[in-house]
């Protein structure tokens, strides 16, 4: 079984890259986010998940072990195979997935082509107790207790901030930072403070 490949990125397709290892080209399927980071002719180390079928051996490559772990984690959900797992990882980072699952945000998954309401619900339900076990992001781990810090409805605030131009990760970080300093803050004040401090230490 192949666990890692180190070589030069050769040609790319919509969902794969050819990795040249000492003159041998390996076809490796990857997420769109991974493919976007690869430059032809540059040297990369890819962590590989090998799937053996009766007639084929498929290689799936990842720049980080975390993405590889989430690739396998997503496939533990009933109805998600390798193609759908890569599609989700093409749209969401592991941190995005963890935040969405933790906040029971089904809509972020429903926005992905091929993910319907039922599958989005299964992702949230089936991964709820699993995502924290494999994520390596301390920032996201620290933010998982956000609902327990304050009675403020953090989901409503995050959605409002996203509508105002924040990324999901920015919204999570700024809400966490403000609530830590002022646990009794109101929703209105939290949003106002977030807007004032968008470029402050909460994003450093």
UniProtKB/Swiss-Prot annotation:
<dbReference type="GO" id="GO:0009378">
    <property type="term" value="F:four-way junction helicase activity"/>
</dbReference>
<feature type="region of interest" description="Flexible linker">
    <location>
        <begin position="143"/>
        <end position="153"/>
    </location>
</feature>
<comment type="similarity">
    <text>Belongs to the RuvA family.</text>
</comment>
<keyword id="KW-0234">DNA repair</keyword>
<comment type="subunit">
    <text>Homotetramer. Forms an RuvA(8)-RuvB(12)-Holliday junction (HJ) complex. HJ DNA is sandwiched between 2 RuvA tetramers; dsDNA enters through RuvA and exits via RuvB. An RuvB hexamer assembles on each DNA strand where it exits the tetramer. Each RuvB hexamer is contacted by two RuvA subunits (via domain III) on 2 adjacent RuvB subunits; this complex drives branch migration. In the full resolvosome a probable DNA-RuvA(4)-RuvB(12)-RuvC(2) complex forms which resolves the HJ.</text>
</comment>
<dbReference type="Pfam" id="PF07499">
    <property type="entry name" value="RuvA_C"/>
</dbReference>
<dbReference type="GO" id="GO:0005524">
    <property type="term" value="F:ATP binding"/>
</dbReference>
<dbReference type="GO" id="GO:0006310">
    <property type="term" value="P:DNA recombination"/>
</dbReference>
<feature type="region of interest" description="Domain I">
    <location>
        <begin position="1"/>
        <end position="63"/>
    </location>
</feature>
<feature type="region of interest" description="Domain II">
    <location>
        <begin position="64"/>
        <end position="142"/>
    </location>
</feature>
<dbReference type="GO" id="GO:0000400">
    <property type="term" value="F:four-way junction DNA binding"/>
</dbReference>
<dbReference type="GO" id="GO:0009379">
    <property type="term" value="C:Holliday junction helicase complex"/>
</dbReference>
<keyword id="KW-0963">Cytoplasm</keyword>
<dbReference type="InterPro" id="IPR000085">
    <property type="entry name" value="RuvA"/>
</dbReference>
<comment type="function">
    <text>The RuvA-RuvB-RuvC complex processes Holliday junction (HJ) DNA during genetic recombination and DNA repair, while the RuvA-RuvB complex plays an important role in the rescue of blocked DNA replication forks via replication fork reversal (RFR). RuvA specifically binds to HJ cruciform DNA, conferring on it an open structure. The RuvB hexamer acts as an ATP-dependent pump, pulling dsDNA into and through the RuvAB complex. HJ branch migration allows RuvC to scan DNA until it finds its consensus sequence, where it cleaves and resolves the cruciform DNA.</text>
</comment>
<keyword id="KW-0227">DNA damage</keyword>
<keyword id="KW-0233">DNA recombination</keyword>
<dbReference type="GO" id="GO:0006281">
    <property type="term" value="P:DNA repair"/>
</dbReference>
<keyword id="KW-0238">DNA-binding</keyword>
<dbReference type="Pfam" id="PF14520">
    <property type="entry name" value="HHH_5"/>
</dbReference>
<dbReference type="InterPro" id="IPR011114">
    <property type="entry name" value="RuvA_C"/>
</dbReference>
<dbReference type="InterPro" id="IPR013849">
    <property type="entry name" value="DNA_helicase_Holl-junc_RuvA_I"/>
</dbReference>
<feature type="region of interest" description="Domain III">
    <location>
        <begin position="153"/>
        <end position="204"/>
    </location>
</feature>
<dbReference type="GO" id="GO:0005737">
    <property type="term" value="C:cytoplasm"/>
</dbReference>
<dbReference type="InterPro" id="IPR010994">
    <property type="entry name" value="RuvA_2-like"/>
</dbReference>
<dbReference type="GO" id="GO:0048476">
    <property type="term" value="C:Holliday junction resolvase complex"/>
</dbReference>
<dbReference type="InterPro" id="IPR003583">
    <property type="entry name" value="Hlx-hairpin-Hlx_DNA-bd_motif"/>
</dbReference>
<dbReference type="Pfam" id="PF01330">
    <property type="entry name" value="RuvA_N"/>
</dbReference>
<dbReference type="InterPro" id="IPR036267">
    <property type="entry name" value="RuvA_C_sf"/>
</dbReference>
<protein>
    <recommendedName>
        <fullName>Holliday junction branch migration complex subunit RuvA</fullName>
    </recommendedName>
</protein>
<dbReference type="InterPro" id="IPR012340">
    <property type="entry name" value="NA-bd_OB-fold"/>
</dbReference>
């Amino acid at each position: 079984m192949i666990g890692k490949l180190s070589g030069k990125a050769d040609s790319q397709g919509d969902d794969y890259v050819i990795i040249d290892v000492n003159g041998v080209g390996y076809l490796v399927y990857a997420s769109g986010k991974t493919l976007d980071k690869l430059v032809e002719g540059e040297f990369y180390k890819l962590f590989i998940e090998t799937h053996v079928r009766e007639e084929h051996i498929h290689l799936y490559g990842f720049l980080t072990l975390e993405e590889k772990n989430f690739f396998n984690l997503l496939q533990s959900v009933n109805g998600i195979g390798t193609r759908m797992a890569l599609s989700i990882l093409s749209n969401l980072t592991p941190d995005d997935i963890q935040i969405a699952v933790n906040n029971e945000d089904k809509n972020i998954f429903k926005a992905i082509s091929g993910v319907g309401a039922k599958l989005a619900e299964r992702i949230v339900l089936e991964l709820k107790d699993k995502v924290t076990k494999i994520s390596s992001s301390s920032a996201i781990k620290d933010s998982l207790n956000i609902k327990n810090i304050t009675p403020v409805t953090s989901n409503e605030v995050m959605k409002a901030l996203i509508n105002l131009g924040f990324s999901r990760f920015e919204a999570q970080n700024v809400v966490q930072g403000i609530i830590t300093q002022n646990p009794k803050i109101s929703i209105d004040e939290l949003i106002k403070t977030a807007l004032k401090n968008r470029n402050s230490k909460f994003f450093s």
